[in-house]
């Protein structure tokens, strides 16, 4: 079969034209669309990678912040626990201290009450013993004992030292030779004369002689008229006598013994009770009666 070259060439040209047309109007738009789509997908993937990277950064940042917050929370919880423990310990210490102070105050109050009670009981016992002693001695007192007490007073008057002698002489001069005699029982005339004879030696104008020194207790026939006796009965003296002149007093009686005994006991007792009570020494003992305005000469005990 013979070849028709015109037809072959025409078909070749048609084929090439078809290829160009397909490429121009079909393949090229498809390829461009594929390229555009590929670029778009690549952009989307790039954006996704960027977002993923940002997300990773955010996650890392948030995890760091969470770790920091957890650390701060742990620190704050620890500080809160420490502060709570310190506050609790402080409250316990304060409560313990307050309780100890209350106990100490209560113990001190109880000791004070006990000391005051002891003081009251002992002072009451002292006064009761003193009152009983006075009562017993008062009941046992008689005339003979009273006479002996006066004799003892006269004997003591004759044995005064120089200072007491001078003080008694000044007291007589200041009183105008007026003497107040206080005793539990009335004085007999002989006893009055005996006292006057003894006191006469203390007159400024009196001159001692040997006859007067040898008859101290004898009742003189002519008592010194310059001395005036004023007698006063004082039952509290029990047995004894007090001579008062010019603000000066000379006493010799059983009541003096009892009073001195009471003073000695209280003098020993008061410092002890004041120590228990926490008082300074001599506190509460200052009173006007402790130092009377007149001078008192206490004759030493036999």
UniProtKB/Swiss-Prot annotation:
Broad class of where this protein is predominantly found: membrane
Tell me, what's a Pfam family for it?
ATP-synt_B
- Transmembrane stretches, start-end: 5-22
Does this UniProt record's set of keywords contain Transmembrane? yes
Q: How does it sit in the membrane?
A: Single-pass membrane protein
Chain segments carrying region Disordered: 278-302
Q: Name one GO cellular component term.
A: plasma membrane
- What keywords sit in the KW lines? ATP synthesis, Cell inner membrane, Cell membrane, CF(0), Hydrogen ion transport, Ion transport, Membrane, Transmembrane, Transmembrane helix, Transport
Its domain of life? Bacteria
- Alphabetized GO MF terms: proton-transporting ATP synthase activity, rotational mechanism; proton-transporting ATPase activity, rotational mechanism
UniProt cross-references to InterPro entries, sorted A to Z:
Alt_ATP_synth_F0_bsu (IPR017707), ATP_synth_b/b'su_bac/chlpt (IPR002146), ATP_synth_F0_bsu_bac (IPR005864), ATP_synthase_B_chain (IPR050059)
What is its subcellular localisation? Cell inner membrane
Q: Name the HAMAP family on file.
A: ATP_synth_b_bprime (MF_01398)
Role = F(1)F(0) ATP synthase produces ATP from ADP in the presence of a proton or sodium gradient. F-type ATPases consist of two structural domains, F(1) containing the extramembraneous catalytic core and F(0) containing the membrane proton channel, linked together by a central stalk and a peripheral stalk. During catalysis, ATP synthesis in the catalytic domain of F(1) is coupled via a rotary mechanism of the central stalk subunits to proton translocation.
- Record-stated family: Belongs to the ATPase B chain family.
PANTHER family hit by this protein: ATP SYNTHASE SUBUNIT B', CHLOROPLASTIC
Subunit-structure text: F-type ATPases have 2 components, F(1) - the catalytic core - and F(0) - the membrane proton channel. F(1) has five subunits: alpha(3), beta(3), gamma(1), delta(1), epsilon(1). F(0) has three main subunits: a(1), b(2) and c(10-14). The alpha and beta chains form an alternating ring which encloses part of the gamma chain. F(1) is attached to F(0) by a central stalk formed by the gamma and epsilon chains, while a peripheral stalk is formed by the delta and b chains.
Could you tell me what this protein is called?
ATP synthase subunit b 1
Naturally occurring in which organism (per UniProt)? Pseudoalteromonas atlantica (strain T6c / ATCC BAA-1087)
């Amino acid at each position: 079969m013979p070849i028709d070259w015109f037809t072959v060439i025409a078909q070749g040209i048609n084929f090439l034209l078809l290829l160009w047309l397909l490429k121009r109007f079909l393949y090229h738009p498809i390829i461009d669309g594929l390229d555009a789509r590929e670029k778009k997908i690549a952009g989307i993937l790039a954006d996704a990678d960027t977002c993923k990277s940002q997300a990773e950064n955010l996650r890392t940042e948030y995890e760091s912040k969470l770790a920091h917050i957890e650390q701060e929370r742990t620190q704050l919880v620890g500080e809160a626990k420490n502060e709570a423990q310190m506050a609790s310990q402080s409250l316990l210490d304060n409560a313990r201290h307050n309780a100890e102070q209350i106990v100490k105050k209560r113990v001190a109050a109880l000791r004070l009450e006990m000391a005051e009670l002891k003081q009251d009981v002992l002072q009451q016992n002292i006064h009761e013993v003193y009152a009983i002693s006075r009562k017993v001695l008062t009941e046992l007192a008689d005339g003979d004992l009273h006479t002996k007490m006066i004799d003892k007073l006269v004997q003591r008057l004759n044995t005064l030292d120089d200072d007491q002698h001078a003080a008694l002489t000044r007291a007589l001069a200041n009183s105008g030779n007026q003497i107040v005699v206080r005793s539990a029982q009335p004085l007999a005339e002989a006893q009055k004369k005996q006292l006057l004879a003894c006191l006469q030696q203390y007159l400024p104008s009196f001159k001692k002689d040997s006859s007067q020194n040898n008859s101290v207790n004898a009742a003189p026939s002519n008592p010194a008229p310059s001395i005036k006796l004023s007698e006063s009965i004082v039952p509290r003296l029990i047995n004894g006598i007090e001579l008062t002149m010019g603000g000066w007093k000379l006493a010799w009686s059983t009541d003096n013994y009892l009073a001195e005994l009471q003073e000695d006991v209280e003098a020993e007792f008061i410092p002890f009770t004041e120590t228990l009570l926490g008082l300074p020494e001599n506190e509460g003992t200052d009173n006007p009666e402790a130092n009377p305005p007149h001078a008192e000469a206490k004759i030493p005990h036999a």
